[in-house]
């Protein structure tokens, strides 16, 4: 033996040919494994394996684990545990794809790799996150520049992370929401660039108080074809970001009248509240009549609907008396007529006037609660009117929202609620005497029938009681008859069995009597037969000597 002294490995005893000889036979082996296999194959006696625990056993066999059933020795406890399944016929390793069971784990692994490799790869892909590393940065020299420096360009590909399907399914809802929000943002930016009127509606001042009271539905803007590549949208938006106008410049009604420019805009539109010129109720009615006439002439409007809307949208007379304008009723009428004509021309020429499900104007899409009664089947409806608050200039889509906004934001009294109209009962028709007499006669006949039925009720109950008692008597008599019939049947059965027994006994007695009589007469006949036999035999003996005598020569 020699000891390996290596600085990297623990000192171990090297096996030589002298120590690898079998203790039971003169064979020698080059390795411990071959010696163990030889002993398991040819020397499986338990006593021999136990002898290996002695001090003269070869190195590597001093800690052998022996099977209690067959006596085989193993170097490791795990090998012995696997071997014990041979004697118990247990197959604990079951294939999850086909249900085949195996005794060893290695056999199950081989089976899966051979028959279920595709399913195993799919199962592994569900739980793994595959991360592909980015390639190394490649630098390129473009030559020296005028400053003497050498510019370098680096190209690096970002790492790609492939999330497994299990994680994708768990986060699918959040990803869908995020993608939907991104698509909405991109669609909004594209519409702002292509449609300048979109900002007029989309960038209007919000009404937080009204939105808390009156529930409004948030509708997405016009659906446009979503581009396939986000990079194209970014390239389209990038050069136009610096040129786009601000929301304040796009809004025609300024929010704050503190500056001179904003005040001049309000004065030009007739919304300056500091002047002294006012309109009374008669002048306002005249302006309304003129507007009705011009609206009825325009081809894209409906006279009845717009007149009702205008009357509903107009503030009360006391509030109108406090409104002051610079241009008077002529300025106000001209402004409204110009707005109406512009909306009519836009409905004829622009593609936004087409009232389709996905291609209508932004104003109609942004106001889903607009009155559908103004739309007709033959002509395209005009866009809904945008009302404004006289105190803060806030745009309001519906006329019913304006009183609520004025009440909640500016302290105006709430609008009067119309009292419910009570419906008067219809006048009763005069009653005819003959019909009343007929009805009374029918009622009296019905009462007489009820009394007759009540009088006949006791008799019916008495008849039912009598019938019930008779039925009870019949049941008892029927039960008695059945019992008597059963008794007769039992008697007949007993008589039949007695007659049969008597017949059998008589037959047996007669046969016995006959045999006895025959036996009583039988002793005379045997004696006669014996006597006749003796006589026949004696006669035959006497005849034989006479024959011999006749045949003799003398």
Swiss-Prot record:
Disruption outcome: RNAi-mediated knockdown, on an RNAi-sensitized rrf-3 genetic background, causes sluggish movement, abnormal morphology and low brood size, whereas when RNAi is targeted mainly at muscle, animals move normally and have healthy body morphology.
Chief location category: nucleus
Listed GO MF terms: DNA-binding transcription factor activity, RNA polymerase II-specific; RNA polymerase II transcription regulatory region sequence-specific DNA binding; zinc ion binding
Biased composition (Low complexity): 142-158
TM segment ranges: none
PROSITE patterns associated with the record: ZINC_FINGER_C2H2_1 (PS00028), ZINC_FINGER_C2H2_2 (PS50157)
Feature: compositional bias, Basic and acidic residues: 544-554
Tissue specificity comment: Expressed mainly in body wall muscles and ventral cord motoneurons.
Region of interest: Disordered: 136-158, 298-319, 342-383, 516-554
Cellular component aspect of the GO annotation: nuclear speck; nucleus
InterPro entries reported in the protein's UniProt record: ZnF_C2H2-type_TF, Znf_C2H2_sf, Znf_C2H2_type
Keyword line: Metal-binding, Nucleus, Repeat, Zinc, Zinc-finger
Domain of life: Eukaryota
Any GO BP: regulation of transcription by RNA polymerase II
Role noted for this protein: Plays a role in regulating synaptic function, probably by modulation of endocytosis. May be dispensable in muscle for normal locomotion. May be involved in post-transcriptional mRNA processing, in parallel with unc-75.
Name of the molecule in the record: Zinc finger protein syd-9
